[in-house]
């Protein structure tokens, strides 16, 4: 008999935000952390993380840069940042900034 519970996947929701020149992440608990920079040049946007060597190719909007960044993230990497980083201070409402919602598999 196989243990099916060990093969289940658990999707965990996250959000990324482009707040001015910063990239912020939010987990299901509502904790918001600073994870990198949003660079803009000649109408193109590039998301670059502070940890590791992760960056996106230039995109036409902050949302597209955030979406490109999602494909480079793993649950373990992002969850580790939430464990080690302190909460970011944000003035204003996060909902007013460009963002992308996504899920990462915990397994």
Task: Give the predicted meaning of each segment.
Residues 1-29, 83, 90-106:
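Negatively charged, low-complexity tracts enriched in Asp/Glu with abundant Ser/Thr
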């Amino acid at each position: 008999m196989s243990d099916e519970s060990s093969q289940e996947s658990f999707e965990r929701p996250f959000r990324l935000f482009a707040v001015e020149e910063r990239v912020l992440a939010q987990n299901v608990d509502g904790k918001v952390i600073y994870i990198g920079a949003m660079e803009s040049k000649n109408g193109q946007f590039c998301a670059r993380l502070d940890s590791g060597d992760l960056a996106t190719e230039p995109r036409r909007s902050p949302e597209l840069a955030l979406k490109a960044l999602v494909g480079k993230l793993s649950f373990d990497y992002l969850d580790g940042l939430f464990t080690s980083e302190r909460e970011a201070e944000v003035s204003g409402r996060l909902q007013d900034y460009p963002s992308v919602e996504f899920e990462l598999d915990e397994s």
